[in-house]
């Protein structure tokens, strides 16, 4: 069995640790922050932007790959690796199920928030709840 050491306890580190464990690795995660501060900047997030071709449970309307790509070009000023960006955009369409499997809950779309409810899925309880769900899942 491989051993994996993950340094940090934010969203990316927790996802890496959980995925390594799912792949059969023995995982050690090191987080220097005390429990009430763990998670780094991830505790300040509130949502996930994800591609979807049709309305879904917590996402209204559609947010197709090409529109997501065009939005990414706007915010990066066109300085981005298209291959990696599109790979990430496509993968975003399936990550909510994986997140739910690890205890993340999403809130239903809010009325009057159509512009963001179309592109973003909001975490119930925000980033702190996201991080805590991943820690609970990792401790199982």
Q: What does each of the following model-derived ranges do?
A:
Residues 1-12, 28:
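Beta1/beta-strand and adjacent pyrophosphate-binding region of the FAD-binding site
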Residues 12-13, 130:
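Catalytic-loop motifs flanking and including active-site residues across diverse enzymes
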Residues 20:
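Aromatic pocket-lining residues of Rossmann-like dinucleotide-binding sites
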Residues 16-17, 96:
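Generic hydrophobic/aromatic pocket-lining and core-packing "Φ" positions
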Residues 32-140:
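Conserved N-terminal/central alpha/beta ligand/cofactor-binding core
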């Amino acid at each position: 069995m491989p051993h994996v050491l993950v340094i940090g306890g934010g969203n990316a580190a927790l996802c890496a640790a959980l995925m390594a464990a799912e792949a059969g690795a023995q995982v050690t995660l090191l987080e220097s922050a005390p429990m009430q501060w763990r998670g780094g900047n991830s505790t300040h997030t509130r949502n996930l932007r994800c591609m979807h071709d049709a309305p879904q449970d917590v996402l209204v309307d559609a947010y197709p790959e090409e529109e997501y790509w065009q939005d990414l070009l706007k915010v990066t000023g066109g300085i981005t690796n298209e291959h990696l960006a599109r790979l990430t955009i496509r993968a975003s369409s399936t990550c909510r199920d994986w997140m739910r499997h690890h205890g993340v809950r999403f809130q239903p779309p809010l009325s009057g928030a159509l512009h963001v409810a179309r592109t973003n899925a909001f975490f119930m309880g925000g980033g702190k709840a996201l991080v805590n769900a991943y820690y609970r899942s990792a401790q199982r």
